């Protein structure tokens, strides 16, 4: 099973610890991006994972590629082009002070990329599963057109397509609403991943559910999933993540999955003293792709995804540096955090 993920990887510049921007004269530099984060998770689980993007021809991009290779992600299909590397700045939240992200992605290499820039015959060679998110079509009109081209080309080759809807209100700035684009892209998706806001903003599908209440109304979330699957008969299933934010460093975390026949709900984790929640959704997506391809039942696949994402909240950086063994131990109830000897 070979998985190809496609999107933008950025230079991540984070204020140290819980400091505000430039409270001290330094920023911690790493790399991250939704689709790359998924590829790293899959490589950590032993899957054949490839990452496709467009990067400039400079030393920072080379460092980024080397970082992906360190985790075992295949980078041979990365295209080099004009433009620059996107950047995002991060402040880590605590208690009632939320985390903050500032994007600097204009004129990045992938934002400038357009249909025809990628040879899809080469890109999809040997690929069984293709993963994309709603972030890439948000960054520019040409990236949106390239994203639509990618899923259409994937389906021409009978490749399974997963999409994390990932609505980002601060990125949709080129004149189109997210729903105008994502409702078209969703026609080519087999496995959808979202939260309630993603479904509402990206697909304009709503059900009266209240995540903040801390209670999962099974029938309402089942109805939300049913509405999506009825609107998009091409979809085989949709997974909806459920985050209850008590504060910036204390979240409840669970998910449900609807395949049109059965409705599955995961265990709920109370995650206190969060180290870094950025990449938590991507670690769920990576866990779900792994789970759907390694477990015979969808309940186990869902539990693997939620447990993997739970662990990511305790790891600094975008990447989920855990193994299958780490995840299955938590699935099995070993969440004490005791020293492993």
Language-model features, listed with the residues they occupy:
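Conserved phosphate/ATP/ADP-binding segment of small-molecule kinases
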Residues: 171-261
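A short helix->loop->beta-strand "cap" motif at the edges of active sites that frequently abuts
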Residues: 153-160, 232-236
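Glycine-rich phosphate/adenosyl-contacting loop at the front of the ribokinase-like
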Residues: 1-73, 94-96, 113-115, 273-275, ...
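Acidic-glycine-rich active-site phosphate/pyrophosphate-binding loop
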Residues: 5-19, 251-267
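Conserved post-catalytic alpha-helical subdomain immediately downstream of the catalytic base
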Residues: 264-334
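Hydrophobic beta-strand scaffold residues
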Residues: 49, 75, 161-162, 193
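Short beta-strand/loop segments at the ligand-binding rim of alpha/beta enzyme cores
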Residues: 158-165, 171
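Conserved N-terminal subdomain of the carbohydrate kinase-like
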Residues: 48-135, 327-341
């Amino acid at each position: 099973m070979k998985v190809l993920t496609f999107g933008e990887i950025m230079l991540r510049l984070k204020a140290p610890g819980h400091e505000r921007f430039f409270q001290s004269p330094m920023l911690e530099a790493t790399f991250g991006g939704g689709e790359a984060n998924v590829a790293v998770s899959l490589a950590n689980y032993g899957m054949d994972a490839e990452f496709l993007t467009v990067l400039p021809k400079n030393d920072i991009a080379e460092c980024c590629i080397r970082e992906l290779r360190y985790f075992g992600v295949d980078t041979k299909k990365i295209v080099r082009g004009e433009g620059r590397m996107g950047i995002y700045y991060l402040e880590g939240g605590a208690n009632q002070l939320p985390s903050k992200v500032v994007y600097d992605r204009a004129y990045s290499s992938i934002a400038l990329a357009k249909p025809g820039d990628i040879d899809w015959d080469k890109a999809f060679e040997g690929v069984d599963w293709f993963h994309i998110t709603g972030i890439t079509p948000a960054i520019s009109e040409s990236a949106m057109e390239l994203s639509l081209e990618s899923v259409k080309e994937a389906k021409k080759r009978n490749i399974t397509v997963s999409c994390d809807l990932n609505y980002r209100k601060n990125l949709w700035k080129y004149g189109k609403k997210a729903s105008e684009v994502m409702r078209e892209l969703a026609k080519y998706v087999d496995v959808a991943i979202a939260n309630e806001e993603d479904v509402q903003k990206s697909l304009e599908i709503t059900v009266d559910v209240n995540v903040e209440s801390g209670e999962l109304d099974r029938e309402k979330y089942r109805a939300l999933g049913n509405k999506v699957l009825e609107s998009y008969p091409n979809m085989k299933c949709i997974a909806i993540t459920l985050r209850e934010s008590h504060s910036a460093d204390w979240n409840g975390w669970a998910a449900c999955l609807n395949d049109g026949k059965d409705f599955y709900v995961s265990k709920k984790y109370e995650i206190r003293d969060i180290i870094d929640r950025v990449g938590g959704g991507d670690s769920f997506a990576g866990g779900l792709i792994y789970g759907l391809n390694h477990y015979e039942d969808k309940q186990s696949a869902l539990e693997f995804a939620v447990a993997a994402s739970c662990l990511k909240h305790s790891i600094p950086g975008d990447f989920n540096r855990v193994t299958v063994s780490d995840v299955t131990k938590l699935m099995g109830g070993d969440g004490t955090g005791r020293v492993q000897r």
